Curated annotation (Swiss-Prot):
Pfam families: AsnA (PF03590). Keywords: Amino-acid biosynthesis, Asparagine biosynthesis, ATP-binding, Cytoplasm, Ligase, Nucleotide-binding. Coiled coil: none annotated. It comes from Streptococcus pyogenes serotype M3 (strain ATCC BAA-595 / MGAS315). The gene is asnA. SUPFAM superfamilies: Class II aaRS and biotin synthetases (SSF55681). This is Aspartate--ammonia ligase. It is found in: Cytoplasm. One of its GO terms (biological process) is L-asparagine biosynthetic process. The keyword Coiled coil does not apply. HAMAP family: AsnA. The lineage of its organism: Bacteria, Bacillati, Bacillota, Bacilli, Lactobacillales. It is an enzyme of class 6 (ligase). InterPro entries: aa-tRNA-synth_II, aa-tRNA-synth_II/BPL/LPL, AsnA.
Amino acid sequence: MKKSFIHQQEEISFVKNTFTQYLIAKLDVVEVQGPILSRVGDGMQDNLSGTENPVSVNVLKIPNATFEVVHSLAKWKRHTLARFGFNEGEGLVVNMKALRPDEDSLDQTHSVYVDQWDWEKVIPDGKRNLAYLKETVETIYKVIRLTELAVEARYDIEAVLPKKITFIHTEELVAKYPDLTPKERENAITKEFGAVFLIGIGGVLPDGKPHDGRAPDYDDWTTETENGYHGLNGDILVWNDQLGSAFELSSMGIRVDEEALKRQVEMTGDQDRLAFDWHKSLLNGLFPLTIGGGIGQSRMVMFLLRKKHIGEVQTSVWPQEVRDSYDNIL
C-alpha cells in the first residue's frame, strides 16, 4: 500500500512540474506568489457565476476587516500586473489554491478544494481580439499535448489528444444541436473532435439562455467578434474516455475593458459593483488590457493519468458514499 501511494504521489508531482515548466516557457509568464485571502469590500474576490458563497475569515489582529478565502485570482492578477508595471506581452502565473464550498455537486470532477494554474498576461497593442484569443488557446493546448507526450514517455500511458484543437462558438453549437442541453452539446462536439475551445460563455444565446453562467466583471462575453457571434472567452474541453464525456480543463478569456464592464454589469443587474475600488480603478483606466484564465491542476493530472475520480489526485473532503465507491481516493 505504501509503495502504491508513493508511486501515485510521484506521478502527480511529475505531471504538475512538467506542465508548469512548459507553461512558463511557452506562454512566457513568470511564476509568482498569490494570496489565499481577499479583503471584503475591495472588489477583488472572484464571484464566479454570482451565486457561490465564499468562506469568511476573521483575523484577530485586523478587527476592522473581514476576509474571504479566494475563489480564484482573476481580479488580483490584473491588479498585480498594473501595480508592478508589467509591459505588453508579459504576464504571470500563480499556483493557486482555493475553496468553493458551494459546489452544487461533489462528484468525479468537482471538489470543494480547487487548485489551478492561474495566469494573466498584458495584451499587446492592437490585439484585443478573437485572433489573439485563439493564438493563446493554441499555445496552452500545445503545453497540454507536450505534457501528455511526456507522461506517455515516462509511464507508458498512450497519448490520445489530437494535434489541433477545434474552435466553435456557442451560437454555432446551439444551432447545430438545438434539441440538446448545453452539457449534451459539449459532449457531442467534443466526442467528435477530441479537443474543443468553446467560444462565448456567459451571454444569452438565440435559444434565450446562456450556455453557462459567468460573472460580469472579468471575462468579456458580450463583445461582437465575427458573423454576429459574441464573446472573447471560452473553455478548453477534451474528450475523457474514462468518464465518457467532455471534460473541462480550462476557463479563460480576454478580460473586460471599461465599456464591456459597464455593459455586462447592467445586463446582470450588478451595477453596485462599480463602487468597489477594483472596479473604479478599471473604469479610470488604471489597469492594462489583459487576457487570463485558470487551468485546473487536479483535473489536468486526473486526465493525463487516466483516473476516474478527481479524489485520486487530490486530498479533499467527500461524502462517505463517495469514499465507499472509489478505492483509491486520497
